[in-house]
From Swiss-Prot:
The gene is metG. Pfam families: Anticodon_3, tRNA-synt_1g, tRNA_bind. Residues 578-679 form the tRNA-binding domain. One of its GO terms (molecular function) is methionine-tRNA ligase activity. It comes from Shewanella pealeana (strain ATCC 700345 / ANG-SQ1). ATP binds at residue 335. Its cofactor is Zn(2+). This is Methionine--tRNA ligase. One of its GO terms (biological process) is methionyl-tRNA aminoacylation. A motif ('HIGH' region) lies at residues 15-25. A motif ('KMSKS' region) lies at residues 332-336.
Amino acid sequence: MANSQRKILVTSALPYANGPIHLGHMLEYIQTDIWSRFQKLRGHECHYICADDAHGTPIMLKAQQLGMTPEDMIAQVQKEHEKDFADFNIQFDNFHSTHSDENRELASEIYIKLRDAGYIKTKTISQLFDPEKSMFLPDRFVKGTCPRCKSEDQYGDNCDNCGATYSTTDLIDPKSAVSGATPVMKDTEHFFFDLPSFEGMLKEWINSGSLQQEMANKLGEWFEQGLQQWDISRDAPYFGFEIPDAPGKFFYVWLDAPIGYMGSFKNLCNKRDDLNFDDFWSKDSTAEVYHFIGKDIVYFHSLFWPAMLEGAGLRKPTSVYAHGYVTVNGAKMSKSKGTFIKARTYLDNLDPEYLRYYYAAKLSSRIDDLDLNLEDFAQRVNSDLVGKLVNLASRTAGFISKRFDGKLAKIADTSLTESFLAKQETIANFYETREFGKAMREVMTLADIANAYVADSAPWQLIKDDAKQEEAHQVCTNALNLFRILVTYLKPVLPKLAQDVEAFLQMELTWDNLDVDLAGHEIAKFKALMQRVEMKSIEAIIEASKENLQVTAEPEVKKQDKTPLEQDPISEEISFEDFAKIDLRIARIAKAEHVKEANKLLRLELDLGGETKQVFAGIKSAYAPEDLEGKLTVMVANLAPRQMRFGVSEGMVLAAGPGGKDLWIMEPHEGAQPGMKVK
């Protein structure tokens, strides 16, 4: 039991109820589930809450296409979502829907409190209207050119390329995504939440440590641009909750979606006598509330949501934790390549615990994107889980059953066990701070030590010598005890494996019984706990995920971007003498790390084969630091040092691409050596 029991409410972002869960979504639910399970393992009161996000124009239109009512469609999708989550061993304490009585009541109650406090304004606006469909177009159903960076094919409310947020009417050359028609302007009265009134409070909350530093920095940029009043209403036809005393006007989905966290918890409280809603959501609540989200919805969760709660006299989240996107094999998930993988497709072919472990092994507290490299995935699972972890039990358990009646020995030398137990708080701290990758590395380092102990002791040899039976008994018992400790450390990540090990060891694995004396304890006969990942299973997933290339090719051609040469024409000619001044050298990236308070930069230490230079490179959006270390690249070695806010940059690395994720550093072929001149 933890020294002081905490009361914790934790949420994941609500999956949208118009389609299936895919492996990009699963990153967040696995991350949150691991953290929630860890809190429970430590003895804390922790409630993991989620719901389907079931409102909005996309759901209304999708239901029309399917010939269903929106209510029937979201009910069907919710069943599919719940099945996928359950099969991935996601342990929600409650999974509900935003289309619920609890959510309707809470949304109306919060709105009325905001209205009565003077935080709701009304004004007539000009909005884009689809003349063919006779409907006002929500932000996501208008596409055009970003008014800031001029990127084409961007949504009506924000730009995926530069991150700008703007009014739909600011979009250049807008088109209706519903009909393709050019929308017309039409006046309508809308309701606005007075977000600027909360600027001071938000700045204080953001700088209190409630957000990751990268998030706080990004929000600082939005404050510089100035907070705007937030449009919280939509016109009929719309699937959602009608605004009180405003016929034909509905709450925008992003108003009632985060309230869905509260609605789901309210639903849980209604089912149980031992839970009180106000204990977690009242202004003076001492409980902890944590939201795990993707980096694409930071704006809503870190500005609108806490401001709404403050205005309604409710408590704000303790923290909001954002994560990055999932790429597959180093690229954006692709339906044509078969890397846009649905959760169900994965589950039809592979053990969910494999993906839980792989994601955990690569997750940190930062907002970096995570690459699901399928070859590395197979190798890591086979090496770590099968080759190291399960191998400990498979090499020793049989001897206990066959030679010692399934009973464990009294361990004479407990030094190895004590060294494993000494890592308990280190690993706990890694879980608590969401440094799951560090926790996995710590556990696998211990697994290496345990396997080395078994290899050096060679119980399969000892067992052949009648005089060494007790020693063999000691070694096998010690190995199984170390195995028990390791599986307990991994229990939040691998709950099904832990359950199977509990059946095998005939005891519950808890954080509090790690140091229990197992002398004389009887275990069950060992059964295989985990199979190796076969590449044919991965290939089957890819094939099952591919869509017909001819179907996807045509729309891609229609919206094809300009060629790189058209986007960035060749510069004016320079003389050979000017070019000769540039000293290009091969360099090895000896170290790469994030730069605190910098959104785009990585600090690189470049080895030139006898000299080291420090370079600040704007490649953070495309590379994780650990993926760069050891690589060869090309740098401008004689660039004059430049004093930056973070230190002196002594050169420049060469990279190609338009920016964002689409950046590629120059990597010379094998044979090039640090210090070589590029001619």
